[in-house]
Design a protein with these regions (language model features):
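Compact Cys/His-rich
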Residues: 24, 28-32, 36
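Local cysteine-cluster metal-coordination motifs and their immediate loop/turn environment
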Residues: 10-26, 49-65
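Iron-sulfur (Fe-S) cluster-binding modules
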Residues: 1-12, 24, 38-46, 67-69, ...
Length: 118
């Protein structure tokens, strides 16, 4: 495997692949987002890592984005393109699936993000 040039990375995504998130489709969502990252030409600037449980099972599958300190919820394969287009390509934080931002006093309790499907 080739060595990754860490100096090119702008965003590091952590994909929860703990038991509950896996049961909710985390593996498929992870694979699809990784595919879209490469397809969009972002493979050098976006690094991805699978993790175990991040402690927000009811909101899963979870993605954490660094260095922004953003947590995203309910990340299914069906939301992958929306996430990549809005967040990684356009640089917009999709509020409907944002769970938390470091430093905020509370979790974003907006309605379920199911409306983002498809």
């Amino acid at each position: 495997m080739a060595l990754k040039d860490l100096t090119l990375i702008k965003t590091h995504l952590f994909f929860c692949n703990g038991g509950t998130c896996k049961n909710k489709g985390a593996e498929e969502a992870t694979a699809e987002i990784r595919r879209l990252i490469v397809q969009s030409g972002l493979g050098e600037s976006v690094h991805t890592t699978k993790t175990l449980c991040n402690g927000r099972c009811k909101d899963g599958p979870i993605i954490i984005s660094q260095p922004e300190g953003l947590w995203f919820r309910e990340m299914t394969m069906h939301k992958a393109e929306f996430f990549v287009q809005q967040y990684l390509i356009k640089g917009r934080v999709p509020e409907r699936i944002r769970l938390y931002r470091y430093g905020e006093p509370q979790i974003n309790v907006a309605e379920s993000s199911q409306a983002v499907e498809g």
